[in-house]
Amino acid sequence: MFLKVRAEKRLGNFRLNVDFEMGRDYCVLLGPTGAGKSVFLELIAGIVKPDRGEVRLNGADITPLPPERRGIGFVPQDYALFPHLSVYRNIAYGLRNVERVERDRRVREMAEKLGIAHLLDRKPARLSGGERQRVALARALVIQPRLLLLDEPLSAVDLKTKGVLMEELRFVQREFDVPILHVTHDLIEAAMLADEVAVMLNGRIVEKGKLKELFSAKNGEVAEFLSARNLLLKVSKILD
C-alpha cells in the first residue's frame, strides 16, 4: 500500500487509535464531527506527532520527518491563506528554497492550470470561497507532493460551487497523478469522488471499502451513521 498509518495519539480525553492503508487512488474519509478526522490528517502531515506507532509513505517511515520534508500537500479546512500576502506569494510560500526563476515558473504554471492566473496580484480578502480553495490547492500542489490531504475542502462553498469544485478535484488527481485523502462528513462528496471510502468513529477506522459495500456493513454504528446520511442524500436529490 502507498500509505500506511498505525499510530496512537491522546489529546486530553480524546484517543486516536488508527490502523489505515490506502493505495494511489482517491480515498474519502467519512465521519461525524469530533471523530478525529482532522487530527488524523495532521498526524499524517507531521503537524501532530503520534504517541506510538508510525506513518509510512511508499514504504518509507516518515514519522521522524518534519512536515516540510514529508512530500505531502495539505489543504486545511480554513485554507490557512496568509491575509497579508498576495495570491502569488501564498502559492510560492512552500518554494522558499527554490531558485527564483524556477519558483516563478512553477507558480505561474500552477495558477494557469487551476484557472487563477488572473488573481495572482490579489489578497485573499478579495477572493470568493471557490477562489480561495483553488489558491490553497495551488499552494499544496506546487511543491509537487507525493500525497495530497484535504480537510473538509468543500465545506465553505455553496452547492453550485461545490459541484464545480468536485469536478476540479478529480481533474487534479488525474492531471497531477497524486493520491488524495479527502476528509468530509458529506456523503455526496464520497459518492461523487471516492474510489474507496473509510469510516472513522470515535478515533478509529471502523470500515473501509467501496461506498456501496459499506451500506451493508455489519457494524451497527457504521450502518446507523451511513443510513442517516443516505436519507439526506436522497432528500437532496428530490429537492434538486
From Swiss-Prot:
Alphabetical list of CDD domains matching this protein: ABC_ModC_like
Q: Which cysteines are joined by disulfide bonds?
A: none
Q: Identify the main location.
A: membrane
Query: Could you tell me which InterPro entries the record lists for this protein?
Result: AAA+_ATPase, ABC_SmlMolc_Importer, ABC_transporter-like_ATP-bd, ABC_transporter-like_CS, P-loop_NTPase
Can you provide one Gene Ontology molecular function annotated for this UniProt record?
Answer: ABC-type tungstate transporter activity
Q: Where in the cell is it found?
A: Cell membrane
Kindly provide the name given to this protein in its UniProt entry. Answer: Molybdate/tungstate import ATP-binding protein WtpC
Q: Which organism is it from?
A: Archaeoglobus fulgidus (strain ATCC 49558 / DSM 4304 / JCM 9628 / NBRC 100126 / VC-16)
- The gene is wtpC
